[in-house]
């Protein structure tokens, strides 16, 4: 990357990024660098001098994108520049993540390193598929076929090189990149895979079949997922966001895209150091007790789920569906690094309190929430 003339900013939707933006715009003004941002994001920052442009223009003009937030913001930034050589600098504003390279206090030093070309660029693989409605989607973490409560298990056939290998019956079947191997795939028992490896990982969450092992495939091998006749209706999640549904008989061709995004690294910490810290591989005692003031539950209505936040980062969620004036609580998922901390109970309590405040009847198909209601019958509608 030569001298940067235009920098694009992508911001966390809720977190205060004002100090980071001021540091970047100050650095840019000294060098005659133009700073661009998305209209809805920069408009909420007081005295922001970044120029508001639409995403397509920002991606075309920027020689560097800076992601200010956590892993979710970083994934969104990577999807914006998918297939381009534009490098992405991840600045962590909140709890430790895997993808961001620097924390906010080190931003000034990082900008100086970019000035002096003291960095490397790491390629990241994406995974792509075409949805049943014809839309092509991409993910840098994973694409998952997830059971819809009330519609039966996810019965999915795995075909490699055109031949059937195994049929899974599970709550979800996940195809992840090495980047995503520490996300949903990890919580399903999948392996941790170095981002330097070009591979796809297939894992089953809560498998009900006799075969429950993960598969690691080379990116040159053809992979397809077939929704079997015995399957229920499945949600198609792309980096954790529901993008569509698959009925029995549907087939998803999964295609890897090596080198789909370029991430800036300064060599301060390795992938394995970040993994050790976030996943608490030395045991839960290392993590310490959670301060109740650090735990926040929010209603992420656009994703149809309640999210529990630790230091502003999503540590778990409770998916729901609102239908005919009722709230149906579907299933919970908690980050493996924070299992055993009572976060699922906090989600259930917050969801039920929210329903009471709205005088909304509640039903639950999530086994955990059903058990919570049995223990706390005063919350049941």
Language model features by range: what are they?
Residues 340-353:
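Conserved acetyl-CoA-binding loop-helix of GNAT-fold acetyltransferases
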Residues 132, 145, 150, 161-164, ...:
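ATP/nucleoside-binding phosphotransfer catalytic cores, i.e., glycine-rich phosphate-binding loops
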Residues 153, 163, 167-171, 175-211:
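Gly/Ser/Thr-rich active-site loops/lids in small-molecule metabolic enzymes
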Residues 353-381:
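C-terminal structural segments of small proteins and small subunits
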Residues 332-339:
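A short, internal acetyl-CoA/4′-phosphopantetheine-binding micro-motif in the GNAT/acyltransferase core
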Residues 1-64, 105-120, 131-137:
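ATP/NTP phosphate-donor binding region
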Residues 304-315:
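Conserved beta-hairpin
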Residues 96-172:
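Catalytic core of DAGKc-family lipid kinases
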């Amino acid at each position: 990357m030569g001298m940067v003339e235009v920098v694009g900013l992508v911001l966390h939707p809720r977190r205060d990024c004002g100090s980071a933006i001021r540091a970047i715009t100050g650095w840019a003004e000294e060098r005659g660098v133009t700073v661009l941002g998305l209209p809805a994001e920069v408009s909420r920052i007081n005295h922001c001098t970044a120029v508001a442009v639409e995403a397509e223009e920002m991606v075309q003009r920027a020689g560097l994108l800076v992601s200010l937030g956590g892993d979710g913001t970083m994934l969104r930034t990577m999807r914006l520049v998918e297939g381009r050589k534009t490098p992405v600098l991840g600045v962590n504003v909140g709890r430790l993540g895997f993808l961001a390279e620097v924390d906010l206090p080190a931003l000034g030093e990082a900008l100086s390193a970019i000035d002096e070309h003291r960095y490397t660029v790491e390629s990241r693989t994406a995974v792509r598929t075409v949805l049943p409605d014809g839309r092509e989607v991409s993910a840098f973490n994973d694409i998952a076929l997830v059971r819809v409560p009330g519609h039966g298990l996810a019965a999915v056939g795995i075909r490699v090189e055109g031949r059937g290998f195994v049929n899974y019956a599970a709550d979800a079947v996940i195809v992840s990149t090495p980047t995503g191997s520490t996300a949903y795939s990890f919580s399903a028992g999948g392996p941790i895979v170095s981002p330097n490896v070009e591979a796809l990982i297939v894992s089953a969450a809560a498998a009900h079949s006799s075969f429950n092992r993960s598969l690691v495939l080379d990116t040159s091998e053809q992979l397809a997922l077939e929704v079997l006749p015995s399957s229920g209706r499945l949600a198609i999640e792309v980096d954790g966001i529901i993008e569509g549904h698959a009925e029995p008989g549907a087939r998803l061709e999964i295609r890897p895209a090596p080198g789909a995004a370029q991430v800036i690294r300064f060599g301060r910490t390795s992938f394995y150091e970040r993994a050790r810290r976030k996943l608490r591989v030395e045991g839960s005692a290392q993590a310490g007790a959670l301060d109740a003031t650090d735990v926040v539950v929010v209603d992420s209505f656009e994703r149809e789920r309640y999210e529990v936040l630790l230091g502003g980062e999503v540590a778990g969620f409770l998916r729901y569906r609102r239908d005919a004036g009722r709230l149906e609580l579907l299933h919970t998922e908690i980050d493996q690094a924070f299992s055993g901390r009572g976060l699922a109970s906090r989600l259930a309590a917050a969801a039920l309190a929210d329903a009471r405040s709205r005088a909304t009847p509640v039903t639950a198909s999530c086994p955990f929430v059903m058990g919570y209601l049995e223990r706390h019958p005063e919350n049941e509608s």
